[in-house]
Swiss-Prot record:
Gene name of the encoded protein: rsl-24D1
UniProt protein name: Probable ribosome biogenesis protein RLP24
Stretches of the chain forming a coiled coil according to its record: none
Role noted for this protein: Involved in the biogenesis of the 60S ribosomal subunit. Ensures the docking of NOG1 to pre-60S particles.
Protein family: Belongs to the eukaryotic ribosomal protein eL24 family.
Protein source organism: Caenorhabditis elegans
């Protein structure tokens, strides 16, 4: 069973599904759904449409130049059937898929990290501004007074420098 890739969006096309478009110069284009076929005929750029793999790669949301993707490349050479070899490839495919999901998770974590840092800084700034709502004015008056004095001193220094 050969699983093809859609020419437009790169999603898998299983046997008995999809549309084939053959141009006059005998190049074959395979599409997974009518949406991809229509957009191809309208000469739309797949990198500019958000649902395609090309667009996801361009925006950094998919793995690029990963060794696990080399194994998905199409090979047109027929291979003689050997049971042991096919069992090894099935085992390798399982380990590769596990590795691929792990790497994809790491990619997502790396992409989210800067946003989390910014969010944390914003929350800390909000806490500093609204400290009077968090801490009761009667409790720990010395700490509040010293902080207030320090803030006044900072504002006075900044005014002097300007």
């Amino acid at each position: 069973m050969r699983i093809e890739k859609c020419y437009f969006c790169s999603s898998p096309i299983y046997p008995g599904h999809g549309i084939q478009f053959v141009r006059n110069d005998s190049t074959v284009f395979k599409f997974c759904r009518s949406r991809c076929n229509k957009l191809f005929k309208k000469k739309k750029n797949p990198r500019k449409l958000r649902f395609t793999k090309a667009a996801r790669r361009a925006r950094g949301k998919e793995l690029i130049n990963d060794a696990t993707q080399l194994l998905e490349q199409r090979r047109d050479e027929p291979v003689k059937y050997e049971r042991a070899m096919f069992q090894k490839t099935i085992e390798a495919a399982k380990t590769i898929s596990a590795l691929k999901t792990k790497r994809y998770g790491n990619l997502i974590r790396k992409r989210l990290q800067p946003g989390k840092i910014v969010q944390k800084k914003g929350l800390l700034a909000k806490v500093d501004k609204k400290m009077h709502l968090i801490r009761a004015p009667v409790a720990n008056r010395d700490g509040v007074k010293t902080r207030a004095a320090a803030k006044e001193k900072k504002t006075a220094e900044s005014m002097e420098t300007n």
